Design a protein with these regions (language model features):
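Conserved residues at beta->alpha junctions
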Residues: 7-10, 50, 129, 154, ...
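Active-site phosphate-binding/coordination module
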Residues: 1-93
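Short, well-ordered alpha-helix to beta-strand connector turns
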Residues: 26, 122-123, 201
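Conserved acidic, metal-coordinating active-site core of Asp-based
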Residues: 62, 66-69, 73-188, 192, ...
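Basic, amphipathic juxtamembrane/active-site segments
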Residues: 1-2, 206-208
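Glycine-rich beta-strand-to-loop/alpha-helix junction loops that act as flexible
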Residues: 33-34, 188-190, 203
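Short, well-ordered beta-strand core segments
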Residues: 29, 204-206
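Residue-level detector of anion-binding/catalytic polar loops
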Residues: 4, 69, 149, 203-204
């Protein structure tokens, strides 16, 4: 009927649950909060809005000012450190999210050095906090930069993306590529990082 069902997620595509990745009829996906718009059938990136390598290193180094666990998404993979992955309870991460993190992170000795060594732009950076005051301080500092988008999908995290990387902007860019008017789009979401998509779609539906 000409209707495209498009998963929009903060995750990388390989981190999306298998039942959704294998659902018949899924051709396009918007991943890492809109940093990547891709044709998942053809394994082709259609649009990307990433943090520069230099920006990403600054944001990862900023994390060291706070008591936070962090990771980075580079070239379709998520990288984390053992010092964080073995102590996720300290950052108030629910068991279900811990399981997902263990399944999707590639362990490296030093995330910052990994990003520096690749020299590649970064799709997204996550911060996780056990202390809400620390989270609020970090959010303020990040927003004061003026060159990143800060959102969250959990009560204890911050998700940092480059300019133009939001689910809403990703939705509108994909719609434009497919010749679909904004008024003909609909978005469903239940998280803070869904707000731009719900606002920008022709019809936005907030789920509880």
């Amino acid at each position: 009927r000409g209707i495209y069902v498009v998963p929009c997620t903060g995750r990388i595509w390989s981190g999306v649950p298998e039942f959704l990745r294998t659902l018949p009829g899924i051709q396009y996906a918007i991943t890492t909060n809109g940093a990547i718009v891709e044709d998942v059938e053809k394994h082709k990136i259609l649009d990307e809005r990433k943090l520069s390598c230099a920006q990403a290193i600054e944001i990862l180094e900023l994390a060291e000012k706070f008591r936070t666990m962090y990771d980075a998404y580079v070239d379709g993979y998520a990288y984390g450190e053992r010092r964080f992955l073995e102590h996720m309870d300290e950052y108030a991460i629910p068991d279900t999210i811990q399981n997902m993190i263990h399944q999707t992170r590639r362990e490296v000795p030093d995330v910052i050095q990994k990003v520096r060594d690749t020299g590649l732009p970064v799709e997204k950076i996550n911060y996780f906090f056990g202390d809400q005051q620390e989270r609020a301080r970090a959010r303020r500092e990040l927003q004061e930069r003026g060159d990143v988008i800060v959102s969250s999908s959990l009560d204890n995290n911050l998700e940092i993306n480059g300019p133009g990387a939001s689910k809403g902007e990703g939705l509108l860019r994909l719609a434009s590529m497919l010749g679909i008017r904004r008024e003909e789009t609909m978005a469903f979401g239940d998280g803070n990082n869904d707000a731009s998509m719900i606002r920008d779609a022709g019809i936005g539906v907030v789920m509880e």
